[in-house]
Amino acid sequence: MKLMDSTLLGRSRFSFFAAMPDSVTQAVSALYDAYPFPPEPMQDGPPPGYNWRWHYPSAYAFCTGRAPQLGRPRILDAGCGTGVSTDYLAHLNPSAEITAIDISAGTLAVAQERCQRSGVADRIHFQQLSLYDVAQLPGEFDQINCVGVLHHLEDPDRGLAALASKLAPGGILHIFVYAEIGRAEIRQMQEAIALLQGERRGDYRDGVAIGREIFSQLPANNRLRRREEERWALENQRDECFADMYVHPQEIDYNTETLRRWIEGSGLTFLGFSDRDRWQPDRLFGSSDTLRDRFQSLSKWQRYRLIELLDPEITHFEFFLGRSPLPQYDWSDNDQLLHAKPVRNECLYGWPSRDIFDPDYRPRTLSEAEYAFLEQCDRPLDSALTVAELLQTSSLDLAAVRQLIDQQLILLVPAQT
């Protein structure tokens, strides 16, 4: 039985089924039938809060700098699991046409029940389908969400190509895959559990039991045990999470170099990591001008690689890809900014109030002038005012407006050209 294979473009692979793609699909489906994932509880009514990556206007603005023109986007949740993301996508995009697919019938049933209880199931088309087979779906999609799925495929290149083929011109694709450096201890434990399971590999309940027994018996100062207790134990109290992490039959982990090559092979454009604060050098280099200057001399992907090497807490990559043509606005042109119409980002927790959480749930206290400006932006687009009109009655200047844009508190609609 083949446990580890590092030959796939330098990516770290964990699989027992390297030569049997159908077996991989069946094994992954069986895991999620046994342990539907993610195991978040259901609720009657909308899910709490938001994830701006699942709010099409916010995601599109992150990728392009402007709010989208589409009033009824088509959204695909590719590998929807138990429907947590699907539920948010439906509530955050009430005018969207949404399709959700997954290979696991058991997991898909949970997703349907979740969305039924929250009141949005009638707006979602659910279908049991492999990512490899998305060509069976009609039409193209303006936004595709694929979180925690591609790294569990036998052939991620084929999976990404399949998704790319369904992305409409100007469409955006959000992806979440594992990072190899931050998951080194996880890979070691995966292989240890598999060795002890032997021929019982594929009995996921046995794998969970063996894994928990290992952790309970390892010395308290053992590195694998410490990592589990310090980083993962809280979420891994749930067997579904423990199974997904330690007894998954198929996993491929990336580093920034293999990620770059994978993206380049897709024919899509890299639009940035959605957790952009993690990729800022200041949090690692402090006040060192020497390190900052050397950092600035590197290429974009060399910078990413350096940050990855210096921060072993990076356990995943989340990022957007897009299909051209995609507009790009940086709002550096004053005239262009003055004629644009700002609208308040709907992903602001605590609004209306001066004390809010921004789209990334960071606390933010608005000044009186900022609050007044956002109040004026909190109106339908057909009655929205331009930045120039708003500044006539505001003490803010263009620099302050640009700060609101950078913090994703407002989204901008360019003037008609």
UniProtKB/Swiss-Prot annotation:
A Pfam family matched in the record: Methyltransf_25
Family annotation (Gene3D superfamilies): Vaccinia Virus protein VP39
GO molecular function: methyltransferase activity
InterPro entries for this protein: Methyltransf_25, SAM-dependent_MTases_sf
Domain of life: Bacteria
Family: To M.tuberculosis Rv2067c.
Protein name per its UniProtKB record: Uncharacterized protein syc1184_c
Source organism per UniProt: Synechococcus sp. (strain ATCC 27144 / PCC 6301 / SAUG 1402/1)
